[in-house]
């Protein structure tokens, strides 16, 4: 109203713009001179001005708002703006802080704009709710500047420097959140500016290569939005939230810091946390709490709570040994009795020869002990009647234990039904193989208590491979080794120097009169990634880049069957311990179950989100274990094809698996040098073992008793672990500390630093018993024989 009057007065030339105080004096003078129209208009302006003191209401609103803004009372300022029903005064570009005189500009000095009408404050123009650190209003242009590509690097650098300078009690938890924030900032930056995204990735990605090297390598090629859709890791991060476990104190500390620095990058980090992270707030962060951290890949049926995983790990499983055919058992016992009688006669003839020595158990007793762990007969009496009495008493004892402790016993340790897995009828070859197993078991080295002088490892080094060897496997009788190469060949060697030709088979070739100790198998058209011998050592399986699996005869050294079904390269193959069946793992994210007499898969195990890298059978043959690049391990029921266990906890792809001979425990090795030990019945992790540094673990193997584990990896070492240590089971390690074979931690660390440098050296856990170093030979395969002899093999790489 007063602005329009001042404008009219300027146009008529009657008055010049004056300060408010002088304008009130002139109005009084005009009234005395008798100018009635001007007196009425000036009277109205005077009445409005006096209603709110020396300033108009709009001036007071502007002054109060600027005062609240200057003092930082933004919440009060917003409430005043929201509840005020008056028109919004135009914002003055000069704030009270920048005026030299300290006086507020007068209302009349504001340039008029009669073409535009003032809008109510409920819908103000050019009004932003964002303010900088000093309380100044942030314009829309500044808001866009905060999301500029160059600010991503500044925001992440600010957070990284703050985490690095935090107190040690908070730094571990804060460092865990850096990785998902880095990934999501990078993916957002790819969509905005690929050039800055590449600069951001190259600058900060080395911080995560030690523990997330596989994912970092996969994200290296992401340079556009189309790449994000095609890349498995990037699409998984984009479509799922990342679960991170933090304490409430640490989360509050982080959010307070980001709110304080909201205008210089904190808002970017806050938006990432709000949109892409799923904080799991706990009182104190433990290793068990962090097992489920990572990308939340949950189906609709899980309702976002992960309940299906818990229900899956509670599904009853039968981990006991597979029941034997009664008629076949009788045949074995009859044959063993004959062998025992022959040994008894031989001992009587050579009375001076102490045959029993350290092992005074008959073959029949050993066979009973193999099938019943409760039977432990160490007496030297070979009388048949006493043997029968002992067996009868043992059976009665077993029945009584089952009655008394039936409720206490774990139902997961019961044996599966025999008809759940169809098997071909037994042959004379199977009978011969079982007798050989009993003999080897009786003569096995006992590792119940590790002695101060550990048994050595028999290491086979393959020379002149030109870095083409890709896999290796030993037969169960440790007589043959088979290796796959990148030029699609398979080579087999005789480890004991005997001929590979079967004397009972006449071969129509030029080598029939010779005794070859090495053979080459030709048939694949791509790199051979895995080989596996059958339990009877008569057949060999091979998986290749050409998407096929081939079955080879060790008698004729020819290919018998080619199994086609996978859509991508086959990474791993494994024969069932019962024979007849085998499993494969492939790049097509599936594992498959096959039988030797069918050219199509019997089961397809689908559920992994990335490559299935390794596969192994349970000792009873009724379950299959798979390790994947999605950092998980799964247990599958052969009879139904369902996933019955999900093992979460690795931070890198799982590339090696081994199952304890008693079927209770599972060990998994990953690309980052971590070995996890799991309880299969509960699906929980028992412990974590470190010692291979940050190098991949290629192979794992259990001893006959299941208390010792050996591992081989890319760090050119074979390491021996005491599995019972730091668990509820009795330890196999002696009370006296082991010093030899670089077994003590100090010597092992010093040797690791000498070999690989400090950057790739990790302090080993206390369950590391011994370390065996090679000369630049990655250990592709480790294996405990049935006699507890440790074998290892690899290709020398100068």
From Swiss-Prot:
Present with 14834 (+/-203) molecules/cell in log phase SD medium. The C-terminal WD40 motifs are required for its incorporation into TFIID and function in SAGA. The gene is TAF5. Residues 329-349 form a coiled coil. It comes from Saccharomyces cerevisiae (strain ATCC 204508 / S288c) (Baker's yeast). PANTHER family: CANNONBALL-RELATED, TRANSCRIPTION INITIATION FACTOR TFIID. Keywords: Coiled coil, Nucleus, Phosphoprotein, Repeat, Transcription, Transcription regulation, WD repeat. The keyword Transcription applies. SUPFAM superfamilies: Taf5 N-terminal domain-like (SSF160897), WD40 repeat-like (SSF50978). GO terms for molecular function: chromatin binding; identical protein binding; molecular adaptor activity; ubiquitin binding. Residues 1-25, 86-110 have a biased composition (Polar residues). This is SAGA complex/transcription factor TFIID complex subunit TAF5. Residues 56-88 form the LisH domain. The modification Phosphoserine is found at residues 299, 411, 415, 787. It holds the Pfam family LisH.
């Amino acid at each position: 109203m007063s602005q329009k009057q001042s404008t009219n007065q300027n146009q008529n030339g009657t008055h010049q713009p004056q300060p408010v105080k002088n304008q009130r004096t002139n109005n009084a003078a005009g009234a005395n001179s008798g100018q009635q129209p001007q007196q009425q208009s000036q009277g109205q302006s005077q009445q409005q001005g006096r209603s709110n003191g020396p300033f108009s209401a709009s001036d007071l609103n502007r002054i109060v708002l600027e005062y609240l803004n200057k003092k930082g009372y933004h919440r009060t300022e917003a409430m005043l703006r929201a509840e005020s029903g008056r028109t919004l005064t135009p914002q003055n570009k000069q704030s009270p802080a920048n005026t030299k005189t300290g006086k507020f500009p007068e209302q009349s000095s504001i340039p008029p704009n009669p073409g535009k009408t003032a809008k109510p404050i409920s819908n103000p123009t050019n009004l932003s709710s964002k303010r900088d650190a000093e309380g100044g209003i942030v314009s829309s242009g500044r808001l866009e500047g905060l999301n500029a590509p160059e600010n991503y690097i500044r925001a992440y650098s600010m957070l990284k420097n703050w985490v690095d300078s935090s107190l040690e009690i908070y730094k571990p938890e804060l460092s865990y959140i850096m990785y998902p924030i880095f990934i999501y900032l990078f993916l957002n930056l790819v969509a905005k500016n690929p050039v800055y995204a590449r600069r951001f990735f190259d600058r900060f990605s080395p911080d995560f290569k030690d523990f997330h090297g596989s994912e970092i390598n996969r994200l290296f090629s992401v340079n556009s939005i189309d790449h994000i859709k095609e890349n498995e890791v990037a699409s998984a991060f984009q479509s799922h939230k990342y679960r991170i476990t933090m304490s409430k104190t640490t989360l509050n500390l982080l959010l307070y810091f980001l709110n304080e620095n909201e205008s210089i990058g904190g808002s970017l980090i806050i938006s990432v946390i709000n949109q892409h992270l799923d904080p799991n707030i706990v009182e104190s962060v433990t290793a068990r709490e962090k097992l489920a951290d990572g990308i939340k890949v949950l189906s609709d049926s899980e309702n976002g709570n992960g309940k299906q995983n818990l229900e899956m790990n509670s599904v009853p499983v039968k981990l006991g040994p597979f029941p034997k055919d009664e008629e076949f058992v009788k045949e074995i016992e009859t044959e063993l009795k004959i062998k025992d009688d022959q040994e008894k006669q031989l001992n009587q003839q050579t009375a001076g020869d102490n045959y029993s020595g350290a092992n005074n158990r008959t073959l029949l007793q050993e066979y009973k002990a193999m099938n019943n762990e409760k039977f432990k007969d160490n007496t030297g009496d070979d009388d048949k009647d006493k043997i029968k009495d002992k067996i009868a008493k043992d059976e009665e004892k077993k029945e009584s234990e089952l009655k008394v402790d039936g409720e206490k016993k774990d139902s997961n340790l019961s044996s599966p039904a025999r008809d759940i897995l169809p098997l071909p009828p037994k042959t004379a070859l199977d009978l011969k193989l079982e007798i050989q197993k009993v003999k080897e078991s009786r003569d096995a080295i006992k590792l119940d208590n590790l002695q101060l002088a550990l048994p050595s490892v028999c290491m086979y080094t393959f020379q002149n491979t030109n870095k083409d060897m890709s896999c290796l496997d030993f037969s169960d009788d440790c007589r043959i080794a088979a290796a796959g190469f990148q030029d699609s060949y398979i080579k087999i060697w005789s480890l004991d120097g005997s001929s590979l030709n079967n004397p009972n088979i006449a071969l129509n070739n030029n080598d029939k009169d010779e005794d070859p100790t090495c053979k080459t198998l030709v048939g694949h058209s791509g790199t051979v990634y895995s080989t596996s011998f059958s339990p009877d050592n008569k057949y060999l399986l091979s998986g290749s880049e050409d998407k096929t699996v081939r079955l080879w005869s060790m008698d004729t050294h020819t290919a018998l069957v080619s199994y086609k079904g996978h859509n991508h390269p086959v990474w791993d193959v494994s024969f069932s311990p019962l024979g007849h069946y085998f499993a494969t793992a492939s790049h097509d994210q599936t594992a498959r179950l096959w039988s030797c007499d069918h050219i199509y898969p019997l089961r397809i195990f689908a559920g992994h989100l990335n490559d299935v890298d390794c596969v192994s059978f349970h000792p009873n043959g009724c379950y299959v274990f798979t390790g994947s690049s999605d950092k998980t391990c799964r247990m599958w029921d052969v009879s139904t094809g369902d996933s019955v266990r999900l093992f979460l906890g690795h931070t890198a792809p799982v590339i090696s698996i081994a199952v304890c001979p008693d079927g209770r425990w599972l060990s998994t090795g990953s690309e980052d040098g971590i070995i996890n030990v799991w309880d299969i019945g509960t699906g929980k992790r028992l412990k974590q073992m470190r010692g291979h540094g940050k190098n991949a673990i290629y192979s794992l193997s259990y001893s006959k008793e299941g208390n010792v584990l050996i591992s081989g990896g890319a760090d050119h070492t074979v390491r021996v672990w005491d599995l019972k240590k730091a668990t509820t089971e009795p330890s196999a390690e002696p009370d006296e500390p082991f010093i030899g074979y670089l077994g003590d931690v100090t010597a092992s660390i010093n040797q690791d630093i000498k070999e690989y440098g400090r950057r790739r050296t990790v302090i080993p856990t206390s369950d590391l018993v011994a370390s065996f170093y090679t000369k630049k030979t990655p250990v592709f395969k480790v294996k405990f024989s049935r006699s507890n002899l440790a074998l290892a093999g690899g290709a020398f790489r100068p």
